[in-house]
Amino acid sequence: MQSITVALDAMGGDFGPRVTVPAAVQALSHFPELKVILIGDQSLITSQLSQLGTSTSSRLSILHSEKVISNSEKPSLALRNSQNSSMRMAIDLVSDNEADACVSGGNTGALMALSRFVLKLLPGIERPALVSALPTISGKRTWMLDLGANVSCDADSLFQFAVMGSALAEEHLGRPPRVAVLNIGAEEIKGNDLVKRCAEMLSQTDAINFVGYIEGNQILHDVADVIVCDGFVGNVCLKASEGTAQLFIEKLKTSMMASTIKGWIARKLFSRLFNELKTLNPDQYNGASLLGLRGIVIKSHGSADVSAIVNALGEAVHEVKRQVPSRISDRLEAVLLERHY
């Protein structure tokens, strides 16, 4: 079995080593091929390992860093002051081929800027895009991009997002994914010039299985496998859907506590419903991919807990196995060749 090494920014996110270290330990038991390099304050990481009753090994190592990029730091400032930071060192390991992928829950803007600066973009890609899987009513997943890396885009960028998202989704699904553009209506006359131009470009491309427009209320209804939008719209949709899912789960918990139904009937009724709603938990889909780079970078939620970070590490393992950057490059080359002729 070929090993896969992931550089984990242990200081990234709201809770730092308190969640990243136990997540790394858990991930090693989930993925036998995985090796993790924890980058961050060595004393804090070692302390967390001691509390877990474990230590470094051939599959778990520590790389000490002196600095942490704060969530409030501007990307331009992060670029200038990134040396010896846990995030920069994690990305550098990928660039130096000492790690196959990196995972960070840190500052999203800084992560995008540093990744683009260090790893560079794939040929033909103008901007990287942030993509993540979302749950659907059928129990399957749909991938949505961009989720905030680019708050304003042109039609060419949206087209490239569609190509990248299609390549990623196909590696998960094993079939050509259905690609749709997010719009305010399903009719061809609806929408602004941006989405209309993107839809026109996609409809003329045989390499993309374009199924037309999708409205916001259809995002979680398994109508499309890949949903394309600019980063402003995508981030708002993502946060709204996550908040709605959390609302349902919390409401159910409150109802369970207040219920007058007793005994095994209550346990049966609420446990079944709770298990169904747990599939909407955003933590199960943690691990947004920064696509378009010459390396694999996974963005974890800043507020992610241990299980959510394990999922992000799992996404990194999957993308390394499937060689996602190469797949995207091949797909883009085929699409550009088709458009040229």
Curated annotation (Swiss-Prot):
GO cellular component, one term: cytoplasm
Keyword Cytoplasm: yes
InterPro entries, alphabetized: FA_synthesis, Phospholipid_synth_PlsX-like
UniProt-listed Enzyme Commission number(s): 2.3.1.274
Keywords: Cytoplasm, Lipid biosynthesis, Lipid metabolism, Phospholipid biosynthesis, Phospholipid metabolism, Transferase
Transmembrane segments: none
GO molecular-function terms, A-Z: phosphate:acyl-[acyl carrier protein] acyltransferase activity
A biological process from GO: fatty acid biosynthetic process
Subcellular location(s) of the protein: Cytoplasm
Reactions catalysed, as given in the entry: a fatty acyl-[ACP] + phosphate = an acyl phosphate + holo-[ACP]
Pathway: Lipid metabolism; phospholipid metabolism
Entry similarity comment: Belongs to the PlsX family.
HAMAP family listed in its UniProt record: PlsX
Known function: Catalyzes the reversible formation of acyl-phosphate (acyl-PO(4)) from acyl-[acyl-carrier-protein] (acyl-ACP). This enzyme utilizes acyl-ACP as fatty acyl donor, but not acyl-CoA.
Name of the protein: Phosphate acyltransferase
Protein source organism: Vibrio campbellii (strain ATCC BAA-1116)
